[in-house]
Amino acid sequence: MVVMAPRTLFLLLSGALTLTETWAGSHSMRYFSAAVSRPGRGEPRFIAMGYVDDTQFVRFDSDSACPRMEPRAPWVEQEGPEYWEEETRNTKAHAQTDRMNLQTLRGYYNQSEASSHTLQWMIGCDLGSDGRLLRGYEQYAYDGKDYLALNEDLRSWTAADTAAQISKRKCEAANVAEQRRAYLEGTCVEWLHRYLENGKEMLQRADPPKTHVTHHPVFDYEATLRCWALGFYPAEIILTWQRDGEDQTQDVELVETRPAGDGTFQKWAAVVVPSGEEQRYTCHVQHEGLPEPLMLRWKQSSLPTIPIMGIVAGLVVLAAVVTGAAVAAVLWRKKSSD
């Protein structure tokens, strides 16, 4: 595996990258990339994205008519032309490096040139509530599996298998961990602070969820209660069901938090209950935008099943659109909070 030079890591001008949120809580900044080979159809596609907290602020796609790092949030549009030229130049260099890495890894694993493969990468830093570095991280995945990760001490690496051991030794010989540590402890933190200040109206807000419970008969003897949380930011939220005050884990379905397409998020949790016992069940919602946790019960005046099913269908379509736009660059976010 080719070792990346520090300047190919999206290092912005003389700044840094980090995450988002209010100073009342933690914030993070992460960059994701994915290089996907496509035998017989030209060079591998490369996509990269940057996030502050839950907000995407930059994006690059090598398949664009004019590939450049582009803004995805209004508060980053104020950066000058030198910023965007530097971002684009570094991202293109990163793309070329990862294309070479794909070839190298295919050789490590003795794989055919006819098959498609994916190399994913993530780097980022978290700030604590005091605005200081909480943790930094860098991770690689190959074909959806862990490959190489920078350890929490920012001085050593963990290799997932024998092939990754080769890359680990190369990184150690080139003192890559020292370069990453300097970036994560300095540049990343500095730029995260800058982004949080420039985008504070958007990034340091807390929009509470709009909540309700719907009822969906399954059979004559049971029904599904679905607890909805809509239009909230940031994305972190907790939905739980209780029966007579005791947490329920069986027969509970919980979907992943989904973007709503307007900068907010959506989520629901459902539980199957015996017909006639609906009032014994309560949904509990915790979110930083709420002054205190909410407790909800189903009311027979709640919206009927048909409109809710329309919302479900809309969420499914929305999730598919968002996933298609993000491609593989956001498929792998494992260990980011380890």
Swiss-Prot record:
Region span, Alpha-1: 25-114
Any one cellular-component term (Gene Ontology): phagocytic vesicle membrane
Region: Alpha-2, residue numbers: 115-206
Transmembrane helix is among the record's keywords: yes
Stretches the record annotates as Alpha-3: 207-298
UniProt name for this protein: HLA class I histocompatibility antigen, alpha chain G
Annotated transmembrane regions: 309-332
Pfam families: C1-set, MHC_I
Residue spans, topological domain Cytoplasmic: 333-338
Region (Connecting peptide): 299-308
S-S bonds: 125-188, 227-283
Glycan attachment points: 110
The UniProt record lists the keyword Endoplasmic reticulum: yes
Keyword vocabulary terms for this entry: Cell membrane, Cell projection, Disulfide bond, Endoplasmic reticulum, Endosome, Glycoprotein, Immunity, Membrane, MHC I, Secreted, Signal, Transmembrane, Transmembrane helix
